[in-house]
Amino acid sequence: LNANLSTRYEAPAVKAFNFAEKSGMLYYITAGDKAEEKPGLYLLNTETGVKTLIKEGDGVFKQVTFDEDGANLAFLYCAQKDSCYKAMSLWLSQQGAPATEVAARGNRAFPKGWVISEHGKLQFSKSASRLFFGTSPEPRQKDTLQLAENRPNVQVWSWDEPVQYTVQDYNKEKELKRSYQAVYHINGGRICQLADEELSQILLGDEGDAPLALLSTSRPYSLSSMWEGRTRSDYYTVS
């Protein structure tokens, strides 16, 4: 409802919606109806009443994200629910225009065998010139054709592993969802993989607009930290 325009907006079968932080832009995802509205992701300017179908589809939308002013909208999309773990693609809408795909599985910037992660956080830099997203090695899937009682349940751990078994077990679910930072440079249309399995931790400066990012890893010191009682790290910069 826009009181200034005395206008009421309605949409059928809405699954999710949200507003931009500093504007009247609203997105919503709908299953649609047979009469008027197609299924997909819509953008509504509540100040002017203009509605745009950003991406048509009844697949899976995730991480739908505005920039601060609502001029850009990014999201992950997969046409098939069962393929989200390996077939997510990154889409971007600028200035209210229909979205275009900017990254997908097999992109040359990704390490071989890596995909866009459905668990990675999607975010714009402060200036909205960069779009950060997550990638990961393609997750392994369980063999659903084999009965659980026929699967061996053996856990092997060596005393000199860098991470203790109890810690591995505690962090298992977190590790399965781990993603690694990548960035899409909106103005140049260029993608860069910033973090990877060797340098997994990243710190962005100036709200994502800094010319350098700080990468770190504590992996070389994981074993010694067991008796030292503290964790050391190596630090690197990436531009």
Question: Which role fits each region the language model picked out?
Answer:
Residues 1-239:
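Beta-propeller folds
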